[in-house]
Amino acid sequence: NIPEGQKVSLQCIWEENVYTSGSSTDYYKQTQATGTTYSLEEGVNLLKMQGPGQLFVMYNVDGEQLLNNPAPIKIHIPLGHGVVNGFFDLEEHKTDAKYAELISKATHKYFCVRGERMMFYFHHLKMLDAAPTEILSAIHLWDDIVGWEQSLMGISQYRQDGKINNHMFAISPEGSYMWASDYRMGFVYTYLKNILLRENVMAAEDN
């Protein structure tokens, strides 16, 4: 059931080309900041995806409604109408052992890790190479970094009060280096070993 007054949708996130010159062949790929959105209504929804990607559930409420602990929702996708890739949710899965199990079974190009404040959406194979068996040190570190930034911005109290629960979205572009925009953070996919494990992050000032 979709609670009255709430908005629920599916968003299909895939890739975009980033052109580095005037040539149509000189580009690299990176994850989109947003994707095609499919609004859901209570009952049966017949949807045809317009392209490939992973589906994210968007359950949007305003800050005041968050204080009332919005009711959970269930979305059922019939067998044969999608592929379960899996993702790691710190709140639900909790352990490095569960992370290792989930990422080893994943089949999609990208794998998602959701922390308290940070969400990694990185190349599956690069992530498997950089952090095959442990992720807690990485997600705790980046959750802390986002928390420090929000404290400096003066908005940490709103999260503590339960008025916001947005996540920072980190991707692994196939070009460029490191950057941040209004919508996401980029860590080039060849550098994930240096930013995923706490000891590697702390090993060099440039990480």
Enumerate the language-model features and the residues they cover.
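Low-complexity, Pro/Ser/Thr- and charge-rich linker/hinge segments at domain boundaries
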Residues: K74-C112
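Catalytic cores of extracellular degradative/oxidative enzymes
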Residues: Y99-K105, K109-N207
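Short, solvent-exposed coil/turn linker segments
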Residues: G43-N45, T95, H123-K126
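Beta-strand-enriched, solvent-exposed domains that form extended recognition/catalytic surfaces
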Residues: N1-F88
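Short linear motifs at secondary-structure transitions and domain/linker junctions
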Residues: Q30-G35, N85-L90, K94-K98, H140-D144
